[in-house]
Amino acid sequence: RGVYIPSDAPASDWDLVEAATRRSDATICLVSALAHHDLTDTIPDRLDVAIPRGARPPVTDAAIAWHRFDRSTFDVGRGTVSVGGTDTEIGLYSPERCIADAFRLRGLIGYETARDALKEWLRRGGRPTSLIEVAALLPRTRTPILHALEVLS
């Protein structure tokens, strides 16, 4: 059930490797994705990984939190990134999608995390129109983002 690697393999983030090998559609999301994009100061205690709703999360020994996202919006803002030290790739949501998910699931990760990520993204030159376009594709997202943008401007 484990992921087997050679003893002389280079150091890597083995939680990412395990998630990517267990499910080909695994996608880094929420706080883990915000941390990957340097949009939060929060250090995730586990890897947040999205899979399509209806898919069964694999059994792993790694510190992975599996989240089920709707199949119709699963690919919105989804790209891939290679896992350092390996030839493995894993899905990663764009900064706009990460912020939209943070507001959509603010009850799970906290409003402050979502707000701080939005502030940092805007400080770096993020365009509100691109964020609103992504938010319009996701349920329960557009209104809280519009309110936060109004307060921050």
Language model features: what each stretch is:
Residues 26, 40-42, 92:
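Hydrophobic alpha-helical segments and helix-packing faces
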Residues 79-153:
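Hydrophobic alpha-helical interaction segments
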Residues 8-15, 74-86:
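Short amphipathic alpha-helical segments and their helix-coil junctions
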Residues 1-32, 54-55, 59-61, 152-153:
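Short beta-edge/loop segments at beta->alpha junctions of small alpha/beta modules
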Residues 5, 20, 50, 67, ...:
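Residues in well-ordered beta-strands of folded domains
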Residues 35-79:
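Exposed, interaction-prone assembly regions rather than primary DNA-binding/catalytic cores
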Residues 3, 27, 48, 63, ...:
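Residue-level preference for alpha-helix termini and adjacent loops
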